[in-house]
Amino acid sequence: MATVVREAFENHVKLVESRNSPGHVLASSEASFFVADLNDIVRKWAAWKKALPDVTPFFAVKSSYDRRLIQTLATCGAGFDCASVEEIELILSLGIGAERIVFTHPCKPVSSLGLCRKLGITLITFDNECELRKLHHHYPEAQTVLRVFADDPTNADPLGTKFGAAREDIDGLVRLVKELNMKLAGASFHAAPSVAVDAAAYVRGIRDAAEVFARARRVGLNPTVLDIGGGYTDSTFQQIAGAVRPAIAECFKSQVVEGRLRILAEPGTLFSCSPFYLAVKVVARRRNAAAFGNEPATRLYINDGIYSNFMMRFIVNMTFSPVAVIRKGVWYDQTEQTMRREACSLWGRSCDSNDCINRDCRLDPEVGVGDWLVFKDMGAYTTVCNTTFNGFTSSNHTIYIEPTQVDKAQSTFEQLELAI
């Protein structure tokens, strides 16, 4: 962790706590807050362009609506994968052009198609006959992208059960595009959500996308866009990139050689997760005379939870463990192997008994009310998942560390040439 991140946390805690006095504690001084190191985004962009230089990242906006994150990616040269009109409007409100957006949701309300037509969002995904006919009726000039089924069957949360055309349906859908005199811009797939580790799922997706291209050419269509989806994380990206490069070279050899292939991807977590750290405050401490089952006797209750920034604990059973404790403005690292630790459990602020962040956490035994716990990798699917359950709201105040190398990473976004 960069020293500047640690200092940002310490300084903010000292500031908010300096405003309190006995009997007069401001609610704002107890609100959880983020520190975001925007330099991390620039480093990730450079790593992406080194590993997959011919693939343009279209950031999956659903993972984070943070405007500074989005603006930094836009400056680097990213496009944007939007799954709703609201996400499209967010991107456009930041002065980012419509040509940098792909509407990736395969099943959309009719009203959104009319708005996309009005706003100039041309690249739109479908995966079934009903959706294609809906597009034909409401937005016939759209540049359609056929999403095919490509999933990792070992994944705990497979997406293929919800979206993606089966191989048996590809031929009929391609022929229907031709029959309706519409444009098939290309093919896409989404191998798995961000817990994916099976790079072979991406290879299967690329091969199925190549089948879409082949069948399209047989009926006189000329697709040029390959969208290899999302699911990339720090731990899986290099493995996936190493499998994707040769698969594209093998399956799309002539298009690559002739410069007739535009390749997109939809990374979300890869860019949004690690730049953000979250500090939450301990609001209560309880020690039971007898442990409940195998749980530790000590329980800590925090001012956040699964209905706020820890929703991924509920969705995919993700484990969260603090990397530091801040006490009276001083940072205490919790990752050092030599430090003394005590078992405890971390509980969220709601009245739901399932609102537990970690049932077996090892922390400084002195942690108590008023201390802050710092968590890393908190940028993806956190603020976007906040609810108002129990009446709680989240301020989600964020302190930004400005990027210093963005000019070196900056590239001019190359507009997709989608004319068929």
UniProtKB/Swiss-Prot annotation:
Gene Ontology biological-process annotations: alkaloid metabolic process; putrescine biosynthetic process from arginine, via ornithine
Keywords: Alkaloid metabolism, Decarboxylase, Lyase, Pyridoxal phosphate, S-nitrosylation
Pathway noted in the entry: Alkaloid biosynthesis
Induction: Expression is induced in loline alkaloid-producing cultures as well as in planta.
Modified positions (S-nitrosocysteine) in chain numbering: C351
Domain of life: Eukaryota
Catalytic activity, EC: 4.1.1.-
Cited PROSITE patterns: ODR_DC_2_2 (PS00879)
Ranges annotated as spanning the membrane: none
Cofactors required: pyridoxal 5'-phosphate
Active site per the UniProt annotation: C351
Cellular component aspect of the GO annotation: cytoplasm
Binding-site list for substrate: I315, V316, D352
InterPro entries linked: Ala_racemase/Decarboxylase_C, De-COase2_C, De-COase2_CS, De-COase2_N, Orn/DAP/Arg_de-COase, Orn_de-COase, PLP-binding_barrel
Record-marked site positions (Stacks against the aromatic ring of pyridoxal phosphate and stabilizes reaction intermediates): H190
Biotechnology: Loline alkaloids show broad-spectrum anti-insect activity, and different lolines may have different biological activities. In vitro tests of NFL, NAL, NML, and semisynthetic loline derivatives with long carbon-chain acylations on the 1-amine have shown that many are effective against both fall armyworm larvae and European corn borer larvae, but the effects seem to differ depending on the modifications. N-Formylloline reduces the weight gain of fall armyworms by deterring feeding, and does not significantly affect corn borers.
UniProt xrefs under Gene3D superfamilies: Alanine racemase, Lyase, Ornithine Decarboxylase, Chain A, domain 1
Entry binding sites for pyridoxal 5'-phosphate: S194, G231, E266, P267, G268, T269, Y381
Residues the record lists as N6-(pyridoxal phosphate)lysine modifications: K62
GO MF annotations in UniProt: ornithine decarboxylase activity
Family: Belongs to the Orn/Lys/Arg decarboxylase class-II family.
Quaternary structure annotation from Swiss-Prot or TrEMBL: Homodimer.
Functional description taken from the UniProt entry: Amino acid decarboxylase; part of the gene cluster that mediates the biosynthesis of loline alkaloids, potent insecticidal agents composed of a pyrrolizidine ring system and an uncommon ether bridge linking carbons 2 and 7. Lolines are structurally differentiated by the various modifications of the L-amino group and include norloline, loline, N-methylloline, N-acetylloline, N-acetylnorloline, and N-formylloline.
Designated name of the protein: Amino acid decarboxylase lolD1
Species of the source: Epichloe uncinata
